[in-house]
Structure formats: C-alpha cells, structure tokens
C-alpha cells in the first residue's frame, strides 16, 4: 500500500479496533404518549431531580414509571422558536462524492467517472457536443458573477417571488493552505438546461449525477426553509418530561433539493412531529407510559461518504484522488464493503500492523498531511522537488534497509525469534524456519523439500464475536457474527444449548424470488458463491459477489461486482442484466 492508502487503511483498521474494544452500556428511556383535544404527542423524560436521567436497569425504569403514573401531567412551559435552514453551498469535489454516496449510492470512482463524462461533453441535440458541468476537481465554492446572475434569473422566472432572496447567497471557501481555488464550484455550464431536457442524451449515471449537481446549484441561490419549533415542558415535581415538535411553514430551497443523510447523523427538524396547540397550565391526558431499553453504541464504521469527509478534514490526499485511494484498498482486498460500510480484511490488518509498526514516522496522519502541503508548494514553485525528495527518501531508505521481512511476518503472527529458534522438527530434529507461500506464511523444516516434508500452518487468532440485531430462527435469542474455517456466519448466543446458525445476509433481496436475502455460501471445496437464503425453495446463485449498488437502468438495488484484466472493473444488475464499466482494464492493472 502507498503512503496515502496506508493512512486511509489505518483509519479503517483503528476504527475497527475501537469497535472491538467497545463495551455496550445499558440505559433506559421513558416516553409518555400524551393527548390534548384528541391530538396525540410524545413527551420524553428529560430530567430527574434537575439532572439528566441515569436509568441503568429495568427496575430503575419501572420505579419511575410507577411514580409518574400517579402524577398529573401539566404544561409548565411553552417555548416557540422560528428556525431557518439555509441551503448548502454548490459542490466541491469532496462534497459531490459525499452527497452522491448518500443520495445515489455511488462509489467515489463511479461519481468521478460520470462527472468526467459530463465535463468532457455530450451531444445534446441542437446544441451539439456540449460540456454540461464545470471542472469537477476543485476545492472552491466560488461561483462566477455571470453564473449567479443566470441562476437568479432562472429562479425568478420559474418560481414564486419568496423563493428568490433579495441578494445573492454567498459562500466562503475554507481558508487554509491545502485548498485549491483555481476553479470555481461544480455547477451546470448552463442552468437553463434542465435535467429532464438532456436526459435522453445521457447514460443513467450521467443523468442522475447531472440532476444532483443542477438541483444543488439552483437550490444554493434560493431562500432558506423556515420552521416553527415548539418545546413543551411538563413539570411533575421531581420529574420533567419534554416534547419537541416542528412544523415546516415555508419550504424554501426544499422545493427543489433535500440533503442526503446517514443513520448516525441524527434527527433534523424535518423528523420532528408537530405538537398540538398548548398553553401554560393545560393538563394533558396520558394514554401510555413506556420504558425502553437501549445500549450505547460503538463509533460507526466508515462509509464511503464519511471516509471521504474524514480524509478531507485531516488533509490526507486530494479530493480528486479519493476515488483511486478507496478503489485501491478494495482491489487489493485490504478492505471489504458490507452494507456500504468498510471492514478491514485479515490481510488489511496485517499490512497496517507491519507498515505502521516499522514506518511510524511515514504512515501517520500528521506526516501525510504535511507532505500534501509540500507537494502543493512544489506545484506553486515555492519548494524545490529534489530537496523535498531527498529529505524524505534519505531516512526512508535507511528504515527500509533495516527491515527484516521474515521478522515482520513473525511479529505480525505473534512469533518471537527466541521461541522460533528453540523449535525443532518433530520428524528429523532439524531447526524450524518461517516461510511464505501462496496461501500465506507457514512453518517448515529447514530441510523441507530436500530430505524432510514437515510443514505446519500458522493458526490464525479467531476474530472476536460481533453482536448483531438478528434473532435466532430456532429459539429467538440474539445472534452474533462468528468466524469459522469458511469465513463469517451468524450463530446463536445460547450455543451449545441451541445450535442455530445461518449465513450472513448481504442486505440485498434475491432477484429471482424477491423474498429472501442473498448471502455468501461455500462449496464443499471451500469456494465462495452467493445464493438465496431460501434455498432449496429458491435456487438463485452467482459466482460474482453482489454489492448494494443501485442499477441506473431499472433501479434494482443489487449488482454483481467483477474485476478482470480483460474487462476491468464492472457492475452487472442482478435483475435486468444492465452492465457498466467502473474502471477500464489499464486502470485495474495499475491500481
């Protein structure tokens, strides 16, 4: 792995270690379903004795429920707020990749390929070959005065007056040494070309990305969305319940565009239900009081969008290289993607452990970020590249010469040199050495292949069980992800009392029966294939791994991923067979 790829891999591996080390803590919440004049709303326990509730068991929660059931729920405070939600800035390379991942399910590579096509131009009928968007490799949110005048004229002609602000909306590009401001933000070259007018001339991916860019740009010059928020307190003495509601009173830029979100980003004003009209002193009916059990959750694994955001925040790589960085990690099988989240593979963890342990000065975030600044300064003519290369390569070459690859592999597998030196071949009594073959490292007699045939595989440390939300189909108990000789699988937590196991579903529906999920399975010889969990009722199977990409042709979520020297990296829809090329053969060969 290269300098930048290794740091990206390090982020993924370190996040996985955080998750493994995380210990969930139980806590409880209490919600009251209230009603006033026939309209219901929910209030949650906000304080106990003036402090945030600390309920860590069912008994503690039930004690509160029993106490508040006897008390009247009276409104003691009503606070109303007027909130405005401003539109986002036009896209930069990074924000385009993030938003396309959230809203369209596109990988960074898929986004940049479609953007490149739109920039290079398409034949759009009477206008002939035309570039549809501005340059797609930029850190700037700056927009030309002519483009702003054009989009304001478009909004004024096509939307009612309240949607056009009195003055243009302005956005500031982040001010730091890494930002490249030579090109303006990503926008349509002509805002009058509506997405539906050019759809017939575009491939499905190109159309969806153009629509995203066009809508975001037009929305960036529209008025804010306006909400009326209401916060109601119901003070029961020692216990305080609170309800928060929101009503959209003017949609503003939402008439055209709504931002994509990921699960961990939390609720917004759009998610809050309305609250009926209430005044201080009103008594409300309580229909139900419900305690709910929760567990604290570990930090989420990186998605493509959140990894791109973190790389940009840390100053690692350039936005234009993010797609190549992520693609390289996947192509070399350092990471795998499950339900659009990155998991490090065993190989990836091994590579990260070796590289970070032996080259700590090079493969850290600060060094890589500083190197990006120096490369930018070379480009600007402020630094001499030979001096920068010498300053880097001199210590690096010395560190490289000192590396003992065999010792690295041994260390990664927990083998100490002194222990290895003591081992003797059980067949001939000779010394034992560490070797590396096509299936990984192994121990062998020093006379192996000459006069002795003794070999011993290195046992891999079993990965810790990972909790899931799945329930056992036999007994209903929670299931965990375990690792066996043929990979990962779901197993009942009550084993050996219950021997319930099943394959891990990919979160992709079977395209044949439309009922079961697809899951990885193994042949008797251990070769992977993917099939429907309803087998033998459904016999669908494929040798190529399904990924949760959306088919641009039919909209089906589920495409086969295939990488070959002949065709490059492709995706083929499991439902309609539509095929698209994500990387040409030469790109795959150099990844």
Residue spans for each PLM region:
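A conserved hydrophobic secondary-structure block that centers on an alpha-helix together
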Residues: 99, 103-107
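Basic, low-complexity terminal or inter-domain segments flanking catalytic cores
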Residues: 61, 139-591
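Phosphate-backbone binding and catalysis cores of DNA-processing enzymes
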Residues: 1-82, 116, 187-247
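Short, hydrophobic-biased segments on the C-terminal half of alpha helices
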Residues: 112-116, 326-327
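Short acidic, hydrophobic short linear motifs in intrinsically disordered regions
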Residues: 75-78, 87-100, 127-135, 298-310
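Positively charged, polyanion-binding regions of nucleic-acid-associated proteins
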Residues: 70-86, 98, 288-294
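Calcium-regulated, polybasic anionic-phospholipid
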Residues: 96, 118, 329
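A short, conserved structural fragment
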Residues: 119-134, 332-341
């Amino acid at each position: 792995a290269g300098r930048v790829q290794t740091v990206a891999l390090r982020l993924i591996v370190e996040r996985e270690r955080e998750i493994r080390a995380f210990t969930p803590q139980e806590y409880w919440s209490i919600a009251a379903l209230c009603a006033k004049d026939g309209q219901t709303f929910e209030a949650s326990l906000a304080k106990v004795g003036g402090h945030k509730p600390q309920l860590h068991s069912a008994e503690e929660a039930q004690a509160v429920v029993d106490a508040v059931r006897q008390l009247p729920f009276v409104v003691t405070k009503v606070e109303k707020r007027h909130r405005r939600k401003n539109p986002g800035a036009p896209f930069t390379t990074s924000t385009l990749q993030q938003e396309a991942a959230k809203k369209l399910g596109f990988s960074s590579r898929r986004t940049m390929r479609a953007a490149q096509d739109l920039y290079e131009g398409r034949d759009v009928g009477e206008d002939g070959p035309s570039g549809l968007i501005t340059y797609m490799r930029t850190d700037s949110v700056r927009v030309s005065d002519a483009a702003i005048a054009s989009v304001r004229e478009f909004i004024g002609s096509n939307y009612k007056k309240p949607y056009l602000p009195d003055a243009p909306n302005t956005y500031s590009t982040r001010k730091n040494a890494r930002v490249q401001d030579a090109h303006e933000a990503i926008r349509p070259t002509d805002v009058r070309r509506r997405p539906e007018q050019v759809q017939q001339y575009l491939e499905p991916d190109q159309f969806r990305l153009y629509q995203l860019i066009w809508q975001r740009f037009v929305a960036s010059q529209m008025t804010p969305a306006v909400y009326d928020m209401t916060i109601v307190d119901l003070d029961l003495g020692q216990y305080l319940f609170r309800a928060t509601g929101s009503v959209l009173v003017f949609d503003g830029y939402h008439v055209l565009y709504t931002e994509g979100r990921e699960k961990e980003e939390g609720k917004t004003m759009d998610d809050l239900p309305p609250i009926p009209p209430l005044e201080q002193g009103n008594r409300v009916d309580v229909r139900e009081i419900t305690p709910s059990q929760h567990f604290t959750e570990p930090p989420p694994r990186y998605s493509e969008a959140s990894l791109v955001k973190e790389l940009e925040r840390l100053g690692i790589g350039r936005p234009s290289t993010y797609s190549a960085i992520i693609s390289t990690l996947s192509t070399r099988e350092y990471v795998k993607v499950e339900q659009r989240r990155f998991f490090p593979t065993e190989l990836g963890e091994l590579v990260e452990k070796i590289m970070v342990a032996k080259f700590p000065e090079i493969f850290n975030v600060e060094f890589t970020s500083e190197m990006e600044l120096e490369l930018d300064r070379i480009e600007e003519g402020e630094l001499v590249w030979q001096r920068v290369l010498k300053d880097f390569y001199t210590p690096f070459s010395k560190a490289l010469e000192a590396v003992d690859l065999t010792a690295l592999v041994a260390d990664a597998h927990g083998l100490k040199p002194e222990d290895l030196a003591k081992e003797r071949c059980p067949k001939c009594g000779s010394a034992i050495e560490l070797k590396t073959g096509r299936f990984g490292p192994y121990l062998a007699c020093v006379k192996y292949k000459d006069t002795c045939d003794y070999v011993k595989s290195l046992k891999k440390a079993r990965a810790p069980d990972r909790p899931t939300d799945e329930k056992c189909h036999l007994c209903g108990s929670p299931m965990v992800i375990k690792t066996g000789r043929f990979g990962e699988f779901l197993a009942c937590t009550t084993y050996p009392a219950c021997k319930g196991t099943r394959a891990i579903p990919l979160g992709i529906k079977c395209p044949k029966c439309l009922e079961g999920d697809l899951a990885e399975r193994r042949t008797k010889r251990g070769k992977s294939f993917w099939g429907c969990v309803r087998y033998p009722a459904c016999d669908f199977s494929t040798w190529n791994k399904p990924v949760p990409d959306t088919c641009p042709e039919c909209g089906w979520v589920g495409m086969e991923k295939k990488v070959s020297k002949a065709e490059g990296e492709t995706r083929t829809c499991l439902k309609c067979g539509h095929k698209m090329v994500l990387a040409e053969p030469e790109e795959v060969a150099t990844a």
